[in-house]
């Protein structure tokens, strides 16, 4: 990959829940069972995820490099065209920063609530 770290596709938990809800409605209307991938359709490297998390949190993240795992593909990006076509689904959180920001906001609110 461009920066030497694995690239993965991400999807926000609310977008994932929305897709599952749409799938349930589809099946209740008599739709056939389908296997579909969910994702943004674009990948982000491990380094890009770290940089995004640093931007969102304002914290420096200290990482360490490790050897690649055996059999781990360098790039995995979901093709969610089937779920878009069948269910009319599309992600509402379309940037890595927005995905990380909502996770960070949730984490901070949970931490505050559990004090």
Label every PLM stretch briefly.
Residues 1-115:
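C-terminal substrate-binding subdomain of Rossmann-fold SDR/epimerase-dehydratase oxidoreductases
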């Amino acid at each position: 990959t461009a920066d030497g770290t694995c690239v993965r596709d991400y999807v926000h938990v609310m977008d994932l829940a929305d897709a599952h809800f749409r799938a349930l409605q589809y099946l209740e209307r008599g739709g056939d069972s389908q296997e579909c991938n969910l994702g943004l359709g674009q990948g982000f490297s491990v380094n890009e995820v770290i940089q995004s998390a640093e931007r969102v949190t304002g914290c420096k993240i200290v990482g360490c490099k490790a050897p690649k795992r055996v059999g781990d593909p360098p790039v995995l990006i979901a093709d969610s065209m089937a779920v878009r076509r069948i269910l009319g689904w599309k992600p509402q959180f379309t940037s890595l920063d927005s995905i990380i920001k909502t996770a960070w906001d949730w984490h901070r609110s949970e931490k505050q609530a559990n004090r």
